[in-house]
């Protein structure tokens, strides 16, 4: 910045001399201008440059008060752009890296004194009186009091890099930078404190980013492991959760019913769960409309609400070769001889057949390849205690309610299958 102000000052001086020459040339008549010889013009230019050169030292070392520049002020010869930059104090930087042996701090200071004496054409003792600061750490160079014309003599000296007008590093105390130098005595000063960047705001998604904000939590691999509800058979038990393989009790309770769900091989199908309470070690008992399953995967028959219904006879829930999950054939749940999801022809509702015993769940099932009154495994019979509470042929109020719900469910499933 100090170099910019120095160049700006020179530009102003050059512009002033150019304006003066323009005014003098405009006053001279046009007829007399060609008669002016080159020698006269040369003497005029030399005279003007000499006048400026002789006037500058008097101005620099005068007691005139300089005015610090403020935004909007007019820049004149007495304007100081930086506080302390009066063109009497100069900073000269040097470079010792090109030398074969590095210099110690004492050798650097001795080189500063010799360079100052050589540039000003004075002795080393006089140069020590001119120097007021130097540095061997933050930068390599020295500061000395001299005129602008004297500073130009340092351009061709070995080791000199920059020649800059110096300014205050501490305007309040009017202190220049570097270590203080007084007649060969160096007083070290701490380096200037630079204002650091503002730290970014803490990120709560990083470790150690601060307290009080939201943190990342680990997901639980099991969702909602809850025991079955205690109550009547007509109530709906809560979903038991979907545990990952190898955890829990070896049972996977898939998510609720999803229509048109396509699933790859060897993956547990997500079934329709209507009051389904799951036990230990039981296979996945799904029902799903439009569910496509590869052949060979074992699928138990449809399991509805916990109310029991008998199967067998003319009023049973008969199922033919295409009943249940059709494997390899049509992908819907159609009993034999029925165009919808419901009981066989001639059956009014899902109820116990004539002569049937206890209408327990999964008893009296008739189908191809199965004998009458064949029961399912114990793991597939849900809530057996509840099924034995009512005598044979006498359904309770919960059974009637469950049958009504089952009829409504079959009606809606039929609509889903058709559409």
Swiss-Prot record:
Top-level lineage group: Eukaryota
Keyword 4Fe-4S: no
UniProt transit peptide range: 1-60
One record GO biological process: cytidine to uridine editing
Annotated region described as Disordered, given as residue ranges: 174-401
GO cellular component, one term: mitochondrion
Localization annotation: Mitochondrion
InterPro entries per record: MORF/ORRM1/DAG-like, MORF/ORRM1/DAG-like_MORF, S8pro/Inhibitor_I9_sf
Description of how the protein assembles with itself and partners: Homodimer and heterodimer with MORF3. Heterodimers with MORF8/RIP1, MORF4/RIP4 and MORF6/RIP6. Interacts with PCMP-E90/MEF13. Interacts with PCMP-H13/MEF35.
Protein name: Multiple organellar RNA editing factor 1, mitochondrial
Organism of origin: Arabidopsis thaliana (Mouse-ear cress)
GN (gene name): MORF1
